[in-house]
Curated annotation (Swiss-Prot):
Cell compartment(s), UniProt: Mitochondrion inner membrane
Name of the protein this chain belongs to: Assembly factor CBP4
UniProt-annotated stretches for the region Disordered: 73-94
Disulphide bonds in the chain: none
Species per Swiss-Prot/TrEMBL record: Saccharomyces cerevisiae (strain ATCC 204508 / S288c)
Organismal lineage: Eukaryota, Fungi, Dikarya, Ascomycota, Saccharomycotina
Length: 147
């Protein structure tokens, strides 16, 4: 004897719900959080991430400013205004990318220069101390003094 149609549909919905629910639970409990991902990065990549964090935030703020300006205008949605469409072949979009790349490169250069300056000042202070020690030793132990 065949089961009623509603029993078969109930079985389909129950199995489908179980598949979807188990997929959701697997996704929720197996995907790492942002902090876990950052903590697992190598120290160099973590440092680079922290350095470029402000740049990404400023880039996002600039994008949100453009989106707000575009949403307040009466122009149709396909007229993006200062925000260039990725399908257009203008060089304006490339210029904004270049601008952010230049800003990023300048920040990296400034940090590198600061690090080099710190190392240089440490070396100068160390050599200055050693030079003073050598001069004091020479004054105390002069080869031409007999007394």
């Amino acid at each position: 004897m065949e089961r009623p149609l509603w029993v078969r549909w109930l079985k389909v919905y129950a199995i489908g719900g179980a598949i979807i629910g188990s997929g959701f639970l697997l996704f929720k409990y197996t995907t790492p959080t942002d902090q876990q991902l950052i903590s697992q990065l190598s120290p160099e990549l973590r440092l680079q991430y922290e350095r470029e964090k402000k740049l990404r935030q400023s880039e996002q703020q600039a994008l949100m400013k453009i989106v707000k300006e575009t949403s307040q205008s009466d122009d149709p949605i396909w007229k993006t205004g200062p925000l260039q469409s990725p399908w257009e072949r203008n060089g304006d979009n490339v210029q904004s990318r270049d601008h952010f790349a230049k800003v990023r490169a300048e920040e990296v250069q400034k940090e590198e220069l600061a690090r080099i300056r710190n190392e240089l000042s440490q070396l100068r202070s160390e050599t200055e101390e050693k030079t003073k020690e050598i001069v004091q030793d020479k004054q105390v132990k002069s080869w031409w003094r007999f007394w």
